[in-house]
Structures are given as C-alpha cells and as structure tokens.
Amino acid sequence: MKLIAESGSTRTEWALVEDNHLVQRVFTEGLNPFFQTRREISRSVRLGLPESFFKKKLDQVYYYGAGCSSYEKKNILGASLVAQFKTPIQVESDLLAAARGLFKCEAGIACILGTGSNSCFYDGKIIVKNVKAAGYILGDEGSGAVLGKLFLADLLKGLAPKELANEFHEKFRISVNDVMESVYNFPFPNRFLGTIAYFLGDYMDNEYVYNLLTNNLRSFFNRNVCQYDYINYPIRFVGS
C-alpha cells in the first residue's frame, strides 16, 4: 500500500492507494516548510490524519508539496513524515505533481493558481525551467493571496468601492486593526489573504473586482508565463 499526498499552503490531500485502486482519501490543513518548522509539520500531520493511517503497513509515502523546491525544505518535510510513518519517503514539489497531472509525458507549460502561484516548463519527464514563485510578498502573481492583498490595500486606503467595502465588513466582521493583526502578526497570513479571494469571487460582475482580477492574472502572464516558449507549447492550469 502507498500513501500519496499533495499539499498547497491551505489544504493537503492524502490518498491511500493499493494495487492502483483508491482505498481512502482524507483532507487536512496545508503544509509548507517555508512557514512551519519540522515539529509544527509533524504535529499537523499527526493531529490531522486518522489514527488508522499510522497503523497501515505502507511501502512508500509520496509527498508533493508547496515550498518543497529546495533540498533543505524537502529534508524538513521528509524528516517530519519519516517520524510519523516510519517508512521510506519521497518528497517533491507540488509543481512537479501539477506538471505530471496536466501533461503526463507531453511537454508544456504547467501553472498553479491557488493560495499561491507557480509555473514551469515541463519536458514530459522533468521540470526544465521554473520562474521563481517568490511568495505572496515578492511574487505569487495571479494567486488568491495576492488578490486578497491588493483588495485589502485598497480597502485600507479608502480606494475600494464603498458598497463593496461595506459588504466586506458586514461579512467578515473585522476591524482595520484585525486586518493588520492577521497580516502582520498571526500565523499563515497567506491563508488569510487567500480567503478574501472567495469573497471577491461573489462580485465578478462588479467592474472594480473584474479589473482587480484581470490585472492580477495579467501580471501572472507578464511576469511568469511570458518567460517560457508559450507560442510553441500548450499552457495548462490547476489550482483552487
């Protein structure tokens, strides 16, 4: 039996597979070694998964996750998972999982648009080129976190439409100070920012929201996709 996991910054999907058949699927909170220590990741995995997962006789655990592009970060995740499952672990980036799922053995440009964003050129076997995602502060164009950041920045400066601002305050029931605390002092500000995207999704017919979303996506293409050979290769997307 194998355990396969795919994780973004917000959610992790775990699948127990035996003889190419799905046995059980479970969702837990997202894991990211850029924002969590080894101990925090271990605790999240232990508390999030059913106890039965740790009693299974597993041949291998395959983990594809956000923030796992470097050897150092892969080691953090790998050590956390080995401590819990006591079985061989293979850790790769969520971008490789996306590329394999989107293209299988075909070459193309794979893109992730979720809480964060990422992209790569995949040659049908491996990732050949990757424009750095750079995170929600320095990059992540097109992502939910950046969309939320752009809206909140306008909201705090009085630039968001009044009706939309009122709707936001009525739905979220948070003050300006609460927003600042969530972004600068609380854990996982990227998750908080990403939730704002769901709110904005209900107002797609609003010209301000439409332009905000369009400009965010355009930025993703201009700063990421355009650095690949997008004229000669297909572009495909996954994400929330």
Q: Which residue ranges define each predicted feature?
A:
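ATP-binding/phosphotransfer module of carbohydrate and carboxylate kinases, centering on a glycine-rich
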Residues: 1-61, 80, 102-107, 152-240
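Short hydrophobic interaction/assembly module
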Residues: 55-74
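Glycine-rich beta-strand-to-loop/alpha-helix junction loops that act as flexible
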Residues: 64-69, 113-116, 232-240
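Phosphate-binding/catalytic loop of phosphoryl-transfer enzymes
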Residues: 68-163
